[in-house]
């Protein structure tokens, strides 16, 4: 059963300033909690485009949203294809777009998906189970230098070199097949003192591999750039992030589009081309409430950023 508790559900949707006949895009449908809350605010002229690359999530969402199916278009795709998705639906502009970038609880908790360092399973970590690249290929086939790079860049792991070297040594004898095999190897690469602090010792490397397998940061950057062009003037974009890499990227992109191009000196009037594309609705990220934390301890790291389109 696909059961997922949506984080900051009300805030994410309420900040979109919902119009009851508007067109909205859920880029990360997941457990459909945000979608259901939004659909309850739309009349029969409103519409939701619901995107997910996980077919299990889409199948579950059709059941969760069964009372609103006439208002929903389900799309099995990666959100980096946002422009093409809307073009294929003959939609030029929408009233709002939102993202929940967390890995859904079922993906983490179902051992067979290979995301969790708590359960033994084959190395997988594919959000889209139709794609070829999995964690198995990354761990067993990527060169030492590439592993060091992703562990450091995507996992901010200070022992990246030591862990990558351990992986390289082990796979010379036999392939690394399962999540718990990998956990043991990661532990070998981290000094005992360091293993006792900072959460689970495999957390950062598993995050890094997951991001690499699913090309998450690049896909998000591509998608946000498209979203900024696809939302109507006055429409909004809501983004929930769960780790510093995503949050930093979101913050930087919103700041860049809020700043606009450098204005040449001496102009009596600032041309529209030099005015900001958007404004940040909240200067600092919104964090989870005590209620969110009581329901879902994964909400502790969640941050919500919202931007409004100006032109």
UniProtKB/Swiss-Prot annotation:
InterPro entries in alphabetical order: RsmH, SAM-dep_MeTrfase_MraW_recog, SAM-dependent_MTases_sf
Q: What is its main location?
A: cytoplasm
Where is this gene product found? Cytoplasm
Listed under GO biological process in this entry are: rRNA base methylation
Functional note: Specifically methylates the N4 position of cytidine in position 1402 (C1402) of 16S rRNA.
Query: What protein family is recorded?
Result: Belongs to the methyltransferase superfamily. RsmH family.
Q: Which domain of life is it from?
A: Bacteria
Q: Which residues bind S-adenosyl-L-methionine?
A: 32-34, 52, 79, 100, 107
Instruction: Name the keywords, alphabetized.
Output: Cytoplasm, Methyltransferase, rRNA processing, S-adenosyl-L-methionine, Transferase
Q: What is its EC number?
A: 2.1.1.199
Identify the GO cellular component terms for this protein. Answer: cytoplasm
In Gene Ontology terms, what is one molecular function of this protein?
A: rRNA (cytosine-N4-)-methyltransferase activity
State the gene name recorded for this protein: rsmH
KW Methyltransferase (keyword) present: yes
Reaction it catalyzes? cytidine(1402) in 16S rRNA + S-adenosyl-L-methionine = N(4)-methylcytidine(1402) in 16S rRNA + S-adenosyl-L-homocysteine + H(+)
Q: PANTHER family attached here?
A: 12S RRNA N4-METHYLCYTIDINE METHYLTRANSFERASE, S-ADENOSYL-METHYLTRANSFERASE MRAW
Q: What is this protein called?
A: Ribosomal RNA small subunit methyltransferase H
């Amino acid at each position: 059963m696909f059961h997922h508790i949506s984080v900051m559900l009300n805030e994410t949707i309420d900040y979109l300033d919902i119009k009851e006949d508007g067109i909205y895009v859920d880029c990360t449908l997941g457990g459909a909690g945000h979608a259901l809350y939004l659909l309850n605010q739309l009349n029969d002229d409103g519409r939701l485009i619901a995107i997910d690359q996980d077919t299990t999530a889409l199948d579950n969402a059709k059941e969760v949203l069964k009372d609103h199916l006439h208002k929903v278009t389900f799309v099995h795709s990666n959100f980096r294809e946002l422009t093409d998705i809307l073009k294929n639906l003959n939609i030029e502009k929408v009233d709002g777009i939102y993202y929940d970038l967390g890995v859904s609880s079922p993906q983490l908790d179902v051992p067979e998906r290979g995301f969790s360092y708590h359960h033994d399973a084959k190395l997988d970590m594919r959000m889209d189970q139709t794609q070829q690249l999995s964690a198995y290929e990354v761990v067993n086939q990527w060169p030492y230098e590439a592993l060091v790079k992703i562990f450091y860049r995507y996992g901010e792991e200070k022992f990246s070199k030591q862990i990558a070297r351990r992986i390289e040594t082990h796979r010379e004898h036999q392939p690394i097949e399962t999540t718990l095999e990998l956990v043991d190897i990661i532990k070998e690469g981290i000094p005992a003192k360091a293993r006792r602090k900072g959460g689970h010792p495999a957390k950062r490397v598993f995050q890094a591999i997951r991001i690499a397998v699913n090309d998450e940061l690049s896909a998000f950057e591509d998608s946000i750039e498209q979203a900024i062009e696809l939302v109507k003037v006055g429409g909004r974009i809501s983004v929930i992030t769960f780790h510093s890499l995503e949050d930093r990227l979101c913050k930087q992109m919103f700041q860049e589009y809020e700043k606009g191009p450098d204005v040449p000196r001496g102009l009596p009037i600032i041309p529209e081309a030099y005015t900001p594309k958007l404004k940040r609705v909240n200067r600092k990220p919104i964090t989870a409430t005590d209620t969110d934390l009581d329901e879902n301890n994964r909400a502790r790291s969640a941050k919500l950023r919202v931007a409004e389109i100006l032109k």
